Swiss-Prot record:
This is Large ribosomal subunit protein uL15. Part of the 50S ribosomal subunit. The gene is rplO. Belongs to the universal ribosomal protein uL15 family. Keywords: Ribonucleoprotein, Ribosomal protein, RNA-binding, rRNA-binding. Residues 1-49 are annotated as: Disordered. The lineage of its organism: Bacteria, Pseudomonadati, Pseudomonadota, Gammaproteobacteria, Alteromonadales. It comes from Shewanella loihica (strain ATCC BAA-1088 / PV-4). One of its GO terms (cellular component) is cytosolic large ribosomal subunit.
Length: 144
């Protein structure tokens, strides 16, 4: 198989519409745009969400909620991912070195998902009850 022998499957690509090429084509004269009006003009049309001057739904509905700025710098780590960290001590810098969290992360929480076989010491990270039980069952410990 070579790149120059590849071609699309039969019926996968349809021919482009050739508009304004006579009435026999079915797309002549007005080219499928109907008669007059804003949408028939070149560059015509209205922006997304415009309702003809009526107060748009987006503005009629109330604002709600916000984006927590702390959530942007907080990561969630699975128990199964702790095995990917080199060494026995797991802290934020160890997670960054193992590429489990990005450089901008300032807080991390270990959650129960998967299993861990080897004992590790978790330092300076928040840990859920289930994750704490799994880490301690594997012989590890949690240091605040």
């Amino acid at each position: 198989m070579k790149l120059n022998t590849l071609s699309p499957a039969a019926g996968a690509k349809s021919a482009a519409k050739r508009v304004g090429r006579g009435i026999g084509s079915g797309l002549g004269k007005t080219a499928g745009r109907g008669h007059k009006g804003q949408k028939s003009r070149s560059g015509g049309g209205v922006r997304v969400g415009f309702e003809g001057g009526q107060m748009p739904l987006k503005i009629r509905l109330p604002k709600f909620g916000f984006t927590s700025r702390k959530a942007m710098v907080t990561a969630e780590i699975r128990v199964s991912e702790l095995a990917k960290v080199n060494g026995d001590v797991v802290d934020l810098n160890a997670l960054k070195d193992a590429n489990l969290v990005t450089r901008n992360i300032q807080f991390a929480k270990v959650v129960l998902s998967g299993t861990i076989e080897r004992p590790v010491t978790v330092k300076g990270l928040k840990v859920t009850k289930g994750a704490r039980a799994a880490i301690e069952a594997a012989g590890g410990k949690i240091e605040e």
